[in-house]
Amino acid sequence: MSDILLELLCVSEKAANIARACRQQETLFQLLIEEKKGAEKNKKFAADFKTLADVLVQEVIKQNMENKFPGLGKKVFGEESNEFTNDLGEKITVELQSTEEETAELLSKVLNGNMPASEALAQVVHEDVDLTDPTLESLDISIPHESLGIWVDPIDSTYQYIKGSANVKSNQGIFPSGLQCVTILIGVYDLQTGLPLMGVINQPFASQNLTTLRWKGQCYWGLSYMGTNIHSLQLAISKSDSETQTENSDREFSSPFSAVISTSEKDTIKAALSRVCGGSVFPAAGAGYKSLCVIQGLADIYIFSEDTTYKWDSCAAHAILRAMGGGIVDMKECLERSPDTGLDLPQLLYHVENKGASGVELWANKGGLIAYRSRNRLDTFLSRLIQNLGPVKTQA
């Protein structure tokens, strides 16, 4: 199984290279944007966009997984269809070709004959990426490939990607908007149980060199399977743990909470959160990025009461958080159940469609979500949130 995760790290980095390449040329970037229509449209945004970068990234992930693990590429699911319409109204199916030249030829149809741009993109698509991790290479875990499914969000926070703001200031390490909020999300789940098993989050625009204006990325991963829990932040955490263990156990129950939220969150939730968290409520763009803030320890909780996140938004982060001892739960179910029932938390699952839905809504996280790293912190947070929501709690 670690061989799959190693391959996902490599394809996520190739995907990040594509995302960066598409942004570096403004004229090229304008060509790549196409508005999403019909059943594909995410109802949260007035104008949602499909970019060729989105489609290319998803196809690269599919093709690479299929080449390395035959059959697995067919079980890569995501938000994007690989059909693109050019300015002449021609529908083009975007697929990786066997050679760089053939891929460039296909891309030139999408890009209205712009061969230099097509060749530049094809080069990045066919470039080999070698990303290794000694921890993963030494891990020996076996799981049949046929029992796995993969959720992909090729470019989460497409709006921030298109807008391309590079000079947004962070608030206590959390960026409210900007390219830092863009993530590539790859989550692996069990087709039978729906549990998330492996996750990769690649942040292509983590930091910018102010001299060269080049962007550097950062990659995070986690694996949670049959009692094995391992993640990329383990070394960083274990170094500080020995010094702060007592302090952390006290903090579980005493200190204020911090939460990261969507700018579109309901006023009732915002008001309750301000009573629970005081001034430590941070708005930020992108479901993937907000989950990453919890993974990084920048916030205790990511909470979202709406039904406009999807399985591809949450699966990768959920797997990493499980490896850390946390998870992502259904917010509505959490607020409706009695805390003293002793029931397991309603973790999000990834294998069952929503009944009666169509299009992307088949895979919406209908009850909203709460992402967390610490179960103890979550329990305390939930009891305080319920107290502060009062009678409106079941409407979330």
UniProtKB/Swiss-Prot annotation:
The entry's keywords: Hydrolase, Lithium, Magnesium, Metal-binding, Phosphoprotein
Question: Which reaction(s) are listed as its catalytic activity?
Answer: 1D-myo-inositol 1,4-bisphosphate + H2O = 1D-myo-inositol 4-phosphate + phosphate; 1D-myo-inositol 1,3,4-trisphosphate + H2O = 1D-myo-inositol 3,4-bisphosphate + phosphate
Which residues span the membrane? none
- The keyword Cell membrane is annotated on this UniProt entry: no
Q: Tell me which EC number(s) this protein carries.
A: 3.1.3.57
Binding, 1D-myo-inositol 1,4-bisphosphate:
156-158, 264, 266, 286-287, 290, 308
**Record text on subunit structure and interactions:** Monomer.
Name by which UniProt lists this protein = Inositol polyphosphate 1-phosphatase
Organism of origin is Mus musculus (Mouse)
For this protein's source organism, the top of the classification is: Eukaryota, Metazoa, Chordata, Craniata, Vertebrata
Gene that this sequence comes from: Inpp1
